[in-house]
C-alpha cells in the first residue's frame, strides 16, 4: 500500500518532472540443480528538486526491459529525465504527453573521463575540454538559480535568455568535430549527437 501510494503521488498531475535511472546488480539464486548468478536491474524514480515533497521509488527488475515502466507511466503527462537508453525513446513514442530530457550528467561524464586523462599541456587545446567547459556553464546556471531560489517562471525566463548562446556554442563544437573513429572523443561526440534533440527540453520547463 505504501509503494502504491508513493507511485500515485509521483504520477500526480502536479509532478511535472520525473528522473529515471537504473543500475545493475548480480543476484544469486538457487534453482533445482545449482546456484546461478544473474545480472538484474534496479530502477529508481524520483521527482524534481523543486517539488515540496520528495519521492524516491526503487523498482527491482530481472531485465533492463522498460515494459513494466511503460505500463505505469502510460498516463503520465510531463518530462522524464533519463539517459539515452532506447527504451525511453519508445516511451515517448507510446505516450505523446511525455517529453524527454536527456541527462546532461551522463553526457558530461563522457568528456570528464577524457579530460582527466589528458596532460596539462594537452587539456586547454583539446576539443573535449572545450565541450566540457560549455556543458559546465549550463550546470553553473542551474546552480545559480537554486541559490537564488528563483520561482519556476523566473527560471524559465532566465533559461530562455541565457541558454541559447551556450547551446549554439555546443552545437558548433559537437557537430563540426571530426574525431578519429573509435576514439573516446568519437564515442562522446556520437552519444551527444544521439541525445541532441532531447538535451534542451529544460529551457521551457
Range-by-range predicted roles:
Residues 1-205:
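Catalytic center-proximal scaffold of phosphoryl-transfer enzymes
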Amino acid at each position: 500500500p505504501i509503494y502504491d501510494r508513493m507511485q500515485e503521488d509521483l504520477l500526480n498531475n502536479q509532478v511535472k518532472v520525473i528522473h529515471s535511472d537504473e543500475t545493475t546488480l548480480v543476484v544469486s539464486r538457487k534453482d533445482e540443480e545449482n546456484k546461478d548468478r544473474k545480472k538484474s536491474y534496479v530502477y529508481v524514480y524520483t521527482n524534481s528538486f523543486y517539488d515540496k515533497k520528495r519521492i524516491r521509488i526503487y523498482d527491482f527488475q530481472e531485465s533492463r526491459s522498460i515494459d513494466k515502466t511503460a505500463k505505469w507511466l502510460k498516463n503520465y503527462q510531463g518530462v522524464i529525465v533519463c539517459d539515452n537508453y532506447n527504451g525511453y525513446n519508445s516511451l515517448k513514442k507510446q505516450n505523446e504527453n511525455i517529453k524527454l530530457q536527456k541527462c546532461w550528467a551522463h553526457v558530461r561524464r563522457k568528456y570528464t573521463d577524457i579530460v582527466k586523462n589528458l596532460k596539462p599541456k594537452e587539456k586547454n587545446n583539446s576539443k573535449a575540454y572545450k565541450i566540457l567547459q560549455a556543458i559546465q556553464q549550463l550546470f553553473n546556471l542551474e546552480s545559480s538559480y537554486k541559490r537564488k531560489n528563483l520561482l519556476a517562471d523566473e527560471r524559465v525566463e532566465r533559461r530562455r535568455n541565457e541558454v541559447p548562446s551556450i547551446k549554439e556554442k555546443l552545437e558548433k563544437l559537437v557537430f563540426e568535430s571530426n574525431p578519429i573513429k573509435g576514439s573516446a572523443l568519437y564515442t562522446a561526440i556520437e552519444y551527444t549527437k544521439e541525445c541532441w534533440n532531447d538535451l534542451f527540453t529544460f529551457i521551457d520547463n
